[in-house]
């Protein structure tokens, strides 16, 4: 089948997200695109061009919903050539205090949601002797960052799952492409941060601003435009030889360097980068001395975000002793 007539299913396509842009990018390449999202967000796909893109309800956390959506496409087209596993949610907060329900939800959607889609689509792709599965990972799936351990872990699982599937599905002519986005401009960060504004942290209540800042970290001024990103991915996926990985977007160079660094050095660099972004917040909150982030501490294997917590604890203890 020609690339101009490929049937593409994309999950998580509400307007404002990257999935919405994937749909438009594949449609520009004359693919038959099926955009999907949960029932509450169906209206957010209403202005996708109906002559090029069809919309349908799909909840990746529900096996019944996934099966129904896939069967609907098969009944209309007889095949699915490309699956873009884009649906996902943010999960921000310190692991020691983030609720297990929130962590489970991140895995349910970000990781198991992709696997549910794969298990429903693969039998059809195998019968047609070909297809491409495009799993959306993240740079933090390779290099985890503070305050986002749950999200990082869910994406790390996607990376491992994709690399395994690539080998297991090769005998059936099915390509597996792992997309590793950097900082891409979308509503993802704002949606995540809004959920955190009124969260009642206990141990970390004084770090609330820093945690919210982490949720917005991917949406800085230099974030890559989502349209540019989606077009790049679509072009690569539709090529005669799709790559195993597509790494693209702001900050991917930094994270690629960190992923090849020795573990101790990688962690220091990640923490120092995060510290630079949130240091002003910390200084306002805790009056931390810049010298505590320099000198011997910065080069030691034991230096990590815990030093900031320790500095704060020491300051609190001194204040209590003086009062």
Q: Which sequence ranges carry the predicted segments?
A:
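Active-site helix of classical SDR
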Residues: 118, 154-157
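C-terminal beta-strand-loop-alpha-helix "lid" module of Rossmann-like NAD(P)-dependent dehydrogenases
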Residues: 170-220
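Canonical Rossmann dinucleotide-binding motif of NAD(H)/NADP(H)-dependent dehydrogenases/reductases
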Residues: 2-34
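Residue(s) in the substrate-gating loop at a strand-loop-helix junction
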Residues: 138
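The beta1-alpha1 cofactor-binding region of Rossmann-like NAD(H)/NADP(H)-dependent oxidoreductases
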Residues: 58-68, 100
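A short, exposed helix-loop element centered on a Lys and neighboring polar residues
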Residues: 118-119, 163
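Substrate-binding pocket helix/loop in short-chain dehydrogenase/reductase
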Residues: 94-95, 102-104
């Amino acid at each position: 089948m020609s690339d101009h007539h490929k049937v593409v299913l994309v999950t998580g396509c509400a307007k404002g997200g990257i999935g919405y842009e994937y749909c438009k990018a594949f449609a520009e390449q004359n693919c038959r695109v099926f955009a999907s999202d949960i029932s509450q967000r169906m209206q957010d796909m209403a202005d996708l061009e109906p002559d090029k893109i069809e919309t349908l309800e799909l909840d990746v956390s529900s096996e019944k919903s996934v099966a129904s959506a896939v069967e609907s496409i098969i009944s209309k087209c007889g095949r699915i050539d490309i699956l873009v596993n884009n649906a996902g949610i943010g999960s921000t907060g310190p692991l020691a205090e983030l609720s297990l329900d929130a962590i489970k939800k991140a895995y349910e959607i970000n990781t198991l949601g992709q696997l549910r889609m794969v298990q429903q689509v693969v039998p059809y792709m195998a019968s047609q002797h070909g297809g491409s599965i495009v799993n959306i990972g993240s740079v933090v799936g390779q290099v985890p960052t503070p305050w986002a351990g749950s999200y990082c872990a869910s994406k790390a699982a996607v990376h491992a799952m994709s690399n395994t599937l690539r080998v297991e599905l090769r005998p059936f002519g099915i390509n597996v492409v792992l997309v590793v986005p950097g900082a891409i401009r979308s509503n993802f960060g704002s949606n995540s941060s809004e959920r955190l504004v009124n969260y009642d942290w206990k141990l970390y209540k004084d770090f609330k601003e820093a945690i919210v800042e982490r949720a917005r970290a991917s949406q800085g001024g230099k974030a890559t435009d989502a349209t540019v990103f989606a077009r790049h991915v679509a072009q690569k996926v539709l090529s005669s030889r799709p790559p195993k990985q597509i790494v693209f977007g702001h900050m991917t160079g930094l994270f690629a360097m960190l992923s090849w660094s020795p573990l101790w050095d990688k962690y220091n660099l990640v923490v120092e980068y995060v510290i630079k972004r949130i240091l002003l917040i910390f200084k306002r909150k805790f009056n931390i001395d810049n010298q505590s982030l320099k000198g011997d501490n910065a080069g030691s294997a034991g230096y990590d975000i815990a030093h900031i917590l320790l500095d704060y604890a020491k300051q609190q203890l001194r204040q209590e002793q003086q009062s």
